[in-house]
Structure formats: structure tokens, C-alpha cells
Amino acid sequence: MENRNLETLAQELGLKKQQVETVLELTAEGNTIPFIARYRKEKTGNLDETQIKAIIDMDKSLTTLQDRKETVLAKIEAQGKLTDQLKAAIEAAEKLADVEELYLPYKEKRRTKATIAREAGLFPLARLILQNSPNLKAEAEKLTSEVFPTFDKALAGAVDILIEAFSEDNSLRSWTYNEIWNNSDITSTLKDQSLDEKEIFKIYYDFEDKVSKLQGYRTLALNRGEKLGVIKVSFKHNLEKMHRFYSARFKQKNDYIEEVINQSLKKKIIPAMERRIRSELTEAAEDGAIQLFSQNLRNLLLVSPLKGKMVLGFDPAFRTGAKLAVVDQTGKLITTQVIYPVAPASQAKIAQAKKDLADLIKKYAIEIIAIGNGTASRESEAFVAEVLKDFPETSYVIVNESGASVYSASELARHEFPDLTVEKRSAISIARRLQDPLAELVKIDPKSIGVGQYQHDVSQKKLSENLDFVVDTVVNQVGVNVNTASSTLLSHVSGLNKTISENIVAYREENGEIASRAEIKKVPRLGAKAFEQAAGFLRIPNAKNILDNTGVHPESYPAVKDLFEQLDITDLDDSAKEKLKALNLKETAEELGLGQETLKDIIADLLKPGRDLRDDFEAPVLRQDVLELKDLSVGQKLEGTVRNVVDFGAFVDIGVHEDGLIHISEMSKSFVNHPSQVVSVGDLVTVWVSKVDLEHEKLNLSLVNPRESN
């Protein structure tokens, strides 16, 4: 790689050149992002996964930009038109769009009016127009031809030449771009209200904002409303100012020049710059939406698992009945059943449903009922709460079932439960989401999980890449039990792919539990490189070697053995842990031939072997009584769980059917730049009711105590 690229990367990302170079070298050697972040900290200067990904992504972008520059320079040079000034401008361009703007006048075009006019020899006439020649008519008559048989048509052809040249002038286009970006407004007006029955886009029926200040979520809303045909989006410019600037380029003036200015400005340059700015606004908005979705997804995947609980999954429905699934403490399916707990079922069927649910609770000692939040959720919650009056030891939780139906109809679900209906598989998924959200949610396309903002309006390729990165990062940070993980979960482990993951599951089924990390090497097609990349992230809870249930990499086992001998440690009891805490990191690292960061991580793992970082995050709120919107009053204090974070606020589940909105203005008494600075998906928060709209079934909440708001 050229030094210029490394320096640009380092400068743009605020890193040392050596860090950038090291990351790119490690990546070229086949190391994964999770592996580099966790086990090569000394080499990278302790960069995390996001920083490493940023280096890799920006390197690709810079390479693409550089390749395009070289192609453009070669093509212009082949035409004999490459000046030193143009070459310097292309080489200095920081965006692909700027390179294309500079290349525009030299780009091969389909035959245009201007092309035909030039071929007919009308260029000298165009020059005479610029000079405001008094003999235009006579000169035009000299240049008439079969294609341009009259002087009027010849003059029109000459004007076409000037319009094309003028509209491709880079300095004019650049000035216009900056003028629109800094000083123009973007507006929207109602086009067809019949396409917006719920008035979702009402705010955009008559909307205006500065282009430079337009927020990302508004950009995406305008795009969607325009695409649906509800609104018309346009720009409002200072055309008089633009016209003055364009006119100043001409020393002479005449009607033909005026036409060149108007045609170039209104028909060529402004539309082109509007398209570019809309595209850039959309790209920035998409990046923001994807970043927010990624952040929400990470927090959702890190929700604390409810381990060791007997759970009943409850997939609500009206006509077809609720599907129930009982899973044991390990997530293994025990039984399924269908009951009819809500209308239109008869009273006799509802009474039978109560008895059936009560029998299941008693028979299997159900501790928690996980109710899906879809159709008939509110009625099902009331039904469950009524039954639980006789079972004070049992609670219920409303679980976000987004994507459960996608999973239940998937090939993976059919393979897991070939004899069950789609609905029963969905109930199992709902129950397991409570027990181990990460293990269950990795089975679902992240886009279907429903914690985003306009996720269907953004680049699906870019969204998938970023969400996959989040899933991979979280899975490896948490670690995976190699003996219980599904092949889907294993496939997200560093160094493993679909085939190797399936081979691990097949190996377990054939040989029983894997007893040690060393045994993992026996799995077919799991070679030395895959083992190196994966081993530290795979856990074996009951292994003879306690290190096999930690994040300590096998490459560090000899050093840990030396450490144990040095400290006379034979077991990780309290005495051993005190010795580890008292270590001088710098001296010990040097003695063991380890980096300080690596030793620090090793000690953290030894102090808490088998630790699950998700245990530090919030667990779901357990309930026994149902709460309805009509029960709420303004100023009432409640506890809730953050379900989704968007640019304008956050949605919180407080136990009523509809999630309440905390607008960004209600998040703090001081200014909040973005909701994600205050709350995250999965957070438990104390809120106060600020508005209850029974008619539209909407709820507004606040994080600010009304008694302290002034």
C-alpha cells in the first residue's frame, strides 16, 4: 500500500499510521476482526472491533477512489486534453462524485444536439455568439447545411453547443452545488391524501427546511412519502442570485447568451445538483439509520438471559387459538398445546383454556410465561394475568415477537422441529428469546427483528453487512458454548463458516460432548487457521482444563501455566484470586513474555471463569397484573423497558399494549443531541406519564420528574 493511503487513513480516523498498517497486515494474513480486537491488542494499540472495521472499510473506499482516478486520468490523457491543473484537481478530489464532475466534459457521450452541431461545423458560430458579433445572421447563413438548413436552425445548433459546454463547466457546477447546500430550502407539498389514510405523512403536507439542516429521519420520511405518491418534494432556490452569478461569466450579452444561461441553469445544472444533493442526503441518512439500527441490535442481543427457568411460550391469536410451548431450563422443548383463551371462542372454550393453562403451570412448575406482542396480545395478557392470580410464584413478560414468524417458517426451524406447525415453532422461539435472546435471535435475519428506523428504505446490502458485523461482534464478545450452540450461532464465531459449524454439530451428535478445546481440532475441515481464529471464543463449561471455559486463547496456555507455578496456584479459589489481583501487570507481563493488555484480559477471565458479560445488562421486567391505558394518569410514575430508539426519541414498554414514546425533548432538563446518548434498547427506565390519548391509543412519557421539571 502507498504511504499516502496509510497517512490518509490515520489522519481521517485519528489513529497512528502504525496502527492502520498493522490492522491491514493482520487482515491480509486472514485474521478476523473479533480475533484481532481480542487477541492482538498489543499490535493494534488496543483498537476495538468498530475501529478495526472502520480501517478496513475506509481502505476499500480509498482504493475504489484511487482506481477511479487512475482510470479517468488515463482516459483524459488519451484524448490529449490532460492539463497539469486538471490532473492536480482530479488527484486532490476526496469524493467519487467530485472525480465524476471533473471528468464530465471529457466523458464519452451518446450523440446529443451539441454533438450534431459540432459535427456540422457550428463551433465557430458559437464563438461568435460569445463575442456578441453584429454579423451573426450572415455568419449563420454561411454555415447552413442539410442538417441545419436555415440560419435560425444554425444559430439554435450553436446555442446547443454553448449550453452543453456551459452546463459541464466544473466551476459553475461546484458553485451551484455549494449554493444549494448552504442556502436553499427543501420543501414538500401534498400530492394525494387518499394514499395516506392514517395521515402518517401529515407533517410533510406543507413542509420546508434548510437543506444543510435537514435531519436524517426527515430525509428518509420525505423519500418514502414521495415514493408512495403522497407528497411532492422539491427545492426552493434564490434563482435571482444564481442568475447574477452565471451572467457575470459573460462579458457580452445578447438573447442567445440569455438562453444559454437559463437553459444551463434551470434545465441542466440545478437538476443535476439537486439529484446529487438528494443522493448525498439519502446516503448520510441511511448511514445514520443503519448506525442506529446496529446500536439497537447490539443492545437487544446483549439483554441479560433468564437462565435456569422453566418457561412457557405463548403465541397469541384470535380465531386459530393461542399456541403454547413449554421449554425446560436448557431451552429443550417439553410439550406444545393449543388453547382458545379469547373471543370469538365460546365461554366454555375460554373456561377450558384457563384450566389447561393452570394444569401446565402446575405440571411443569412454570416460572415465567413469555407472551408474544402481536395479534391478540392485549387480550391474551389479560387472560394470563387472571390465571396467575392463583399462582403467585409465576410471572409473565411481554416479548417482542418481531421475526418469530420469519424464523418459524424457515428451513432452520423446519430442521429443528420437523413435526410441528409454524405457529408452535413460533411459540418455542418466543420462550427461548427470554431464556437466551442472543442464541435465539441469531437464527433470524437481523432486518426482521424490528429495532430500526426506516430499515426497509435504506441500502439493504449495506444494512445487512453492518448488522452481520454487529451479530458477529456480540457473539464473539459473549463467547459460545461449543456443546450446546446451534450451527447458526456457531457460524458467527470467528473463523467458522456454515460448513464447519454444521460439522461441529454433527461431530457432537456422533461422539458426544466435546471435552476440550484441543478436541475441536478433530472436527472435519476445521484446520489450523480456523482453530486459531475460533478457539478463544468457544467455551467448554465442564472441561478438565478450566481455561477452556474462559476467553484465554490456547496460545497463552503455556504462559498461564508458568503464572500458576510462579504463584503456586492449583485451583482458582479465593486465595488464588487474591494473588492474581495483587500482581504487578507490567513486571509479570515481561516475565511471561506477554503484552500487558493480554495479561490484563487473562486475569479478568481467571477471576470470573465462565463469566457472561450479558449478566451486567438489564433483565426483562416481570409482571403479574395487567395494566391498561385507561388506568394511567398524567404524572404517574412507572418502570419500563426501552424497546426501540429512534432519532426523535425512544419507545418504552410499561406494560400496556402500546409502547409509550419519550420524545427527545422529554429525556432531560438539559439539551440532548441524540436519544442514544441517554437510553439504549433493553434499558430499564423510570418514567412519568405526560399524555394519554385514549381515542388514538397513544401514550407519551417523560424521563423528567414533573415535580423537578421547572
Question: What is the meaning of each model-derived region?
Answer:
Residues K16-K17, E29-G30, L96, L122, ...:
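Short flexible coil/turn linkers enriched for glycine and charged/polar residues
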Residues T32, T44, D48-P149, Q477-D616, ...:
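Accessory alpha-helical DNA-binding modules that contact the DNA backbone or grooves
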Residues Q51-K53, L65-K75, Q79-G313, A317-D419, ...:
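Duplex nucleic acid-engaging cores and interfaces of nucleic-acid transaction enzymes
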Residues D98, V397, G403, S408-V478, ...:
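Long, charge-rich intrinsically disordered scaffolds of nucleic-acid metabolism proteins
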Residues E139-E141, V147-F151, F207-K210, G229, ...:
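Low-complexity, acidic/Ser/Thr- and charged residue-rich accessory regions of DNA metabolism proteins
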Residues N178-I186, F314-F318, T375-E379, V399-V406, ...:
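A glycine-rich phosphate-binding loop feature that marks nucleotide/adenosyl-phosphate handling sites
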Residues R276-S294, S448-G479, E587-V634:
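Long, charged amphipathic helices and adjacent flexible linkers at domain junctions
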